[in-house]
Amino acid sequence: MEHYISLFVKSVFIENMALSFFLGMCTFLAVSKKVSTAFGLGIAVIVVLGIAVPVNQLVYSFILKDSALVQGIDLSFLNFITFIGVIAALVQILEMVLDKYFPALYNALGIFLPLITVNCAIFGGVSFMVQRDYTFVESVVYGIGAGTGWMLAIVALAGITEKMKYADVPAGLRGLGITFITVGLMALGFMSFSGIQL
């Protein structure tokens, strides 16, 4: 149990998808204007990562891995296309659920919801799972932890962005300029976790 807790903490803080690896920056910067929208997208990313990483782990272990289906046959060259297909299917299902049960969040996320399909944070989580050879349970923990870390970062950025509306930001830095500086400072803060050995 201690191993899974340390894997979760590591994926949230030490190896944060957004602030350590800078993955998923397109939606991270675009949807960080309001805390409510950022929180909704963060939940969507947690759900997609929490399902996509373990599902792709099963696909990789039982179909694509060397000698998984038939002795001597290696289908790992199909990793990218297969993982993207699984992620796209999961995002499509999530999009239908949000449209039916949470229409306000669906409309607020707009074009960025389908973009989760090609969000490199999702694909990065799956790639890290393969590279690190996680088991199914480790994949579940890692997927949920990585999604939680990404959500933590985007909600924090959205909160700071909302507060900056009342700040006297120099004209040349308004908009993305101050956002990039803020993200850089947040990443510096998360770098302090990099020395922790779990």
From Swiss-Prot:
Composed of six subunits; NqrA, NqrB, NqrC, NqrD, NqrE and NqrF. It is an enzyme of class 7 (translocase). It comes from Pasteurella multocida (strain Pm70). It is a multi-pass membrane protein. Its EC number is 7.2.1.1. NCBIfam families: nqrE. It is found in: Cell inner membrane. Belongs to the NqrDE/RnfAE family. It catalyses: a ubiquinone + n Na(+)(in) + NADH + H(+) = a ubiquinol + n Na(+)(out) + NAD(+). The chain crosses the membrane at residues 11-31, 35-55, 77-97, 110-130, 140-160, 176-196. This is Na(+)-translocating NADH-quinone reductase subunit E. It comes from the Bacteria. GO terms for molecular function: oxidoreductase activity, acting on NAD(P)H, quinone or similar compound as acceptor. The gene is nqrE. GO terms for cellular component: Gram-negative-bacterium-type cell wall; plasma membrane. The lineage of its organism: Bacteria, Pseudomonadati, Pseudomonadota, Gammaproteobacteria, Pasteurellales. The keyword Translocase applies. Keywords: Cell inner membrane, Cell membrane, Ion transport, Membrane, NAD, Sodium, Sodium transport, Translocase, Transmembrane, Transmembrane helix, Transport, Ubiquinone. The keyword Lipoprotein does not apply. Its main location: membrane. One of its GO terms (biological process) is sodium ion transport. NQR complex catalyzes the reduction of ubiquinone-1 to ubiquinol by two successive reactions, coupled with the transport of Na(+) ions from the cytoplasm to the periplasm. NqrA to NqrE are probably involved in the second step, the conversion of ubisemiquinone to ubiquinol.
